[in-house]
């Protein structure tokens, strides 16, 4: 999902969060895939979320793509969500 609205209860089920000083979409998806999670999400530049799916199986509401324009902590050519905005990746 290009840009989702997150909330304090989180949108990814059974989520764990890692704060990565070198966060990028690639770093986060690699971390989550290595832990056998089905989903990864980047948020607020340095946050990486791994989850088993969407909470209650419900896709979170979409946000404007421009809301996910915070630069990643690990690469200034990549975007890593925004404030309460998450870019979500699903492994196939």
Residue ranges and their predicted role:
Residues 1-92:
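Peripheral, non-catalytic regulatory segments
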